[in-house]
Amino acid sequence: MKSKAAEDATVARREVTIVNELGLHARPAAEFARRARAFRSEVWLVREGKRFSAASLIEILRANLDQGATATLEAKGRDAEAAVEKLSRLLESFKDGK
């Protein structure tokens, strides 16, 4: 069994590509931030060496994620792997300009 410190230190990462034809604009970014806040782990989008809090709509919009842009979805904490898995699937579901 992992110690609490080991669980809190769990880090998960996944490269993601934005598929929405309008990019990660306000509506999907707001949904993404809302879902990211549901996890106990801290979650970030990392792009071009900069980290943006996935729990903040403003931070997500600052990342300027247009269609085809790539970023690393990174989470640290006890549910990091679940956060990365579920949030990466959510990003893939934002299609057709919605």
Regions found by a protein language model. Name each.
Residues 2-10, 71-75, 79-98:
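C-terminal binding/interaction regions
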Residues 3-4, 17, 23:
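Proteins with a high burden of low-complexity, intrinsically disordered sequence enriched in S/T/G/P/A and R
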Residues 5, 13-15, 29-30:
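Short hydrophobic/aromatic-rich motifs at helix boundaries and adjacent loops
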Residues 10-20:
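Short amphipathic
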Residues 24-26, 30-83:
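Amphipathic, hydrophobic secondary-structure cores in small proteins
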